[in-house]
Amino acid sequence: MDTNMSLFNQINSLAYWFLFQTNYKSSVIFDADKDCFFVTIKKSGKPLYSHRISDFSKRKTRLLQFELVAIANSLLHIKQTIRQKPQMA
């Protein structure tokens, strides 16, 4: 579970970076009532990335870890792309 907690922290940190360091909007929602985890990144009100994990508490640990790693990697890729844009111009 420590690995999953670390991944949650990384995802939240990346969402915070998008929100305060860019003109992108981010949200991370963990809804215990609906048993889901949802991450979204938007630019100018249009979805750029979203991922939803339904039946969160019923997921096997390794599958959940795989999905959280995929989310973190996707957000890191978007962050890297944003940082490279000024260098390309």
PLM feature spans:
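Negatively charged, low-complexity tracts enriched in Asp/Glu with abundant Ser/Thr
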Residues: 1-34, 46-89
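Short polybasic amphipathic segments
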Residues: 36-42
